[in-house]
UniProtKB/Swiss-Prot annotation:
Belongs to the peptidase M17 family. Presumably involved in the processing and regular turnover of intracellular proteins. Catalyzes the removal of unsubstituted N-terminal amino acids from various peptides. HAMAP family: Cytosol_peptidase_M17. Its cofactor is Mn(2+). It comes from Buchnera aphidicola subsp. Acyrthosiphon pisum (strain APS) (Acyrthosiphon pisum symbiotic bacterium). This is Cytosol aminopeptidase. Its EC number is 3.4.11.1, 3.4.11.10. It comes from the Bacteria. The lineage of its organism: Bacteria, Pseudomonadati, Pseudomonadota, Gammaproteobacteria, Enterobacterales.
């Protein structure tokens, strides 16, 4: 499906459908008023019949409007003009797709006027991403081929010609971010018998072929891990026939404007049974999503390469599988991490932090200025923040504020939680430097405290996305979060100007 930006006369557009906004009390937007005048009041006469009130959720399809070349006009209710926010705007756009996608409509022109969502850049970007999200189809592994929509192209009409340049920039960014989000979702939604640690490494290597001028990939296999002393990482994968692979993706942009080295680490547990501390059977199938952190890092690197960001970015996909087997690590084991610190294992289902701790230590060789790890780490974070908000932890206030700012810009909500010294005491061990799990309280915080012990040499942030990375139930599947947030963080580091 293609997107286009242009400034046009709506009555002259030969298209299948023009979408315009109507507000409460049947107040027409400027675009709707223009079409109404061109049709000699035809739209007003139909609205007077009372079939649309302008409330959010209202839609009315008009056919063969006089003196209008478009085959249809879709009036979309937007509620009260001064109460439209990002959430309502997304709902409005979703309603338009619901009204259109089952019809034989291939080409659409959107002309949304009198809607104030920040500036034209954010208006266009949010439109494109919301429309793409509404049209996303989860990959199904079956022999049924169902076409979800006939839509081939969407044109966004820009009212003011002076806004065309920034609108085209917004479209470029939105399409790159959507590519990142869609790639993340598609990878996350794969079944674990297909997407295993080796498969993750193949996906990483594909990037070095597609973006050969900017991306280099190194794969760390179990032999190399042993040489490096990554014993915690290795231990997690010992129970599985699918051996661990760590993919190191190095992106180098052209004409670099920011000399900082930015690194992302993604937890890539392609399946997590819990190991010997086995999980309950109910919902265990969803543990294929325990690699959503790695998928998010993978997607974010795609965006950087698509937009040729003038940055140096490293992404690590920490691929592993936690299974029950005769070689599985056990509660009571003591592991020596790559950093030399020792960990007493009290629960084998607290495995993500063991994979991440060695990955975080490995990153030291690149002397990164910023490291952000992304992980479906703890159920405790879901208990604390629910399924709408990700947890944020950091050892650096400036980095934390930058992520919070990107969160506000993208409406991908995160919330900062503490790393006070009192929480570190929960990890005390009698026989090792510390244990891999606390005593049952503040689990998301103690998990972050564990990771913080391996991040002393750089500015670090941890995003716990256990509650936000996927949805359960009838419309289950990966959400693609927090990819847009991470992409926005990189755009901000790139000094892009939006207006």
């Amino acid at each position: 499906m293609n997107f286009f930006i242009k400034s046009c006369f709506l009555d002259k557009e030969k298209t299948d459908c023009i979408v315009v906004s109507v507000f409460e009390l049947s107040e027409l937007s400027d675009s709707a008023i223009y079409l109404d005048k061109c049709s000699n009041g035809h739209i007003t006469s139909l609205i007077k019949l009372g079939d649309i009130q302008g409330k959010i959720g209202d839609t009315l399809m008009l056919y063969k409007v006089p003196k209008i070349l478009s085959k249809r006009i879709l009036l979309v209710g937007c509620g009260k003009k001064d109460e439209i926010n990002i959430i309502r705007f997304k709902k409005i756009l979703k309603n338009t797709i619901h009204a259109i996608k089952k019809k034989s409509i291939t080409n659409i022109v959107y002309s949304f006027s009198n809607i104030n969502i920040d500036n034209i850049y954010w208006m266009i970007r949010r439109m494109v991403l919301s429309l793409k999200e509404s049209l996303y189809e989860t990959i199904k592994i079956n022999n049924i081929n169902i076409k979800n929509t006939n839509i081939h192209s969407i044109t966004l009409n820009i009212i003011k010609k002076n806004d065309l340049f920034i609108a085209k920039t917004a479209l470029k960014h939105a399409l790159a971010i959507d590519h990142a989000i869609t790639s993340t979702k598609n990878l996350s939604n794969l079944p674990p018998n297909i997407c295993n640690p080796l498969y993750l490494s193949y996906k990483a290597q594909e990037l070095s072929k597609k973006y050969e001028n900017n991306i280099v990939v190194e794969i760390i296999d179990i032999k190399k891990m042993k040489e490096l002393g990554m014993n915690a990482y290795i231990a997690v994968g010992n129970g599985s026939k699918n051996k661990p692979f760590m993919s190191v993706i190095k992106y180098s942009g052209n004409n670099i404007v920011n000399k900082k080295i930015i690194a992302f680490v993604g937890k890539g547990l392609t399946f997590d049974s819990g190991g010997i501390s086995i999980k309950p059977a109910l919902h265990m199938h969803e543990m294929k999503y325990d690699m959503c952190g790695a998928a998010a890092v993978y997607g974010t690197l795609i965006m950087a390469a698509e937009l040729q960001l003038p940055l140096t970015v490293i992404g690590i996909l920490s691929g592993c599988e936690n299974m029950v087997g005769s070689h599985s690590f056990r509660p009571g084991d003591v592991l020596t991490t790559m950093s030399g610190q020792t960990v007493e294992i009290l629960n084998t289902d607290a495995e993500g932090r063991l994979v991440l701790c060695d990955s975080l230590t490995y990153l030291e060789r690149f002397s990164p200025d910023i490291v952000i790890d992304v992980a479906t780490l703890t159920g405790a974070c879901v208990t604390a923040l629910g399924e709408s908000v990700s947890g944020l932890f950091s050892n650096n206030e400036e980095l934390s504020n930058q992520l919070l700012h990107a969160s506000q810009e993208t409406d991908d909500k995160i919330w900062s939680l503490p790393l006070f010294s009192e929480y570190h005491k929960e990890l005390n061990s009698d026989i090792a430097d510390f244990s891999n799990i606390g005593r049952g309280k503040a689990g998301a915080i103690t998990a972050a405290c564990f990771l913080s012990k391996f991040t002393k040499k750089y500015n670090w942030a941890h995003l716990d996305i256990a509650g936000t990375a996927w949805k359960s139930g009838k419309k289950s599947g990966a959400t693609g979060r927090p990819v847009e947030l991470l992409c926005q963080f990189l755009l901000n580091q790139s000094n892009y100007i939006y207006n």
